[in-house]
């Protein structure tokens, strides 16, 4: 069986990607942090597409929570690995820089940029050992050109874009 993890998979883009991967025959691991009902709805939609999945609730900004959830999954699936990772989790807390709080800045970067790092780093070793993996990072035009009121979001998405380019150079020869 082929497994795909979609962070922020309970709604919006994450839900749409989960459904598309389900159509492609993947077992979908739907990550989310807070909205149980929406995660259940995404799981139902995945099943309606003829595939299956499971809900994987963890805080993508907490390395210990990520490790616990993914290690638990791995111990229940010792002969399997997650071959597709969709880093989709992210939030916007728009505000002009002049009035932006440190919390608004840090929360956006923590979820979008640090979450990408923590989850990707955890899954990367198995992809490299198996010599196959796909990592798709959902970003925004805001990460390329910046948008007023989105200094935090632009910085986070721009960071993911740059990290994606660097990571590709590190792992492409290993078919990841």
Residue ranges and their predicted role:
Residues 98, 145-151, 173-174:
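Active-site loop immediately N-terminal to the catalytic Tyr-X3-Lys motif
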Residues 10-12:
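Conserved glycine-rich cofactor-binding loop
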Residues 82, 96-97, 104-109, 135:
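Substrate-binding pocket helix/loop in short-chain dehydrogenase/reductase
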Residues 36, 57-69, 102:
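The beta1-alpha1 cofactor-binding region of Rossmann-like NAD(H)/NADP(H)-dependent oxidoreductases
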Residues 140:
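Residue(s) in the substrate-gating loop at a strand-loop-helix junction
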Residues 120, 156, 164:
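Active-site helix of classical SDR
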Residues 125, 169-173:
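Alpha-helical segment proximal to the catalytic Tyr-Lys
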């Amino acid at each position: 069986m082929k497994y795909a993890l979609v962070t922020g998979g309970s709604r919006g883009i994450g839900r749409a990607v989960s459904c598309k991967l389900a159509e492609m025959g993947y077992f979908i691991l739907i990550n989310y942090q807070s909205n149980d009902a929406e995660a259940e709805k995404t799981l139902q939609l995945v099943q309606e597409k003829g595939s299956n999945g499971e809900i994987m609730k963890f805080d993508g900004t907490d390395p210990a929570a990520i490790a616990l959830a993914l290690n638990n999954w791995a111990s229940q699936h010792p002969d399997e690995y997650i071959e597709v990772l969709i880093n989709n989790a992210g939030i916007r807390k728009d505000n002009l820089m002049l009035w932006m709080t440190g919390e608004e800045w840090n929360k956006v970067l923590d979820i979008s940029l640090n979450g990408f790092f923590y989850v990707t780093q955890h899954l990367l070793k198995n992809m490299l050992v198996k010599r196959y993996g796909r990592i798709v990072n959902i970003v925004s035009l805001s990460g390329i050109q910046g948008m007023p009121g989105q200094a935090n979001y632009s910085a986070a998405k721009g960071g993911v874009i740059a990290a994606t380019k660097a990571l590709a150079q590190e792992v492409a020869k290993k078919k990841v």
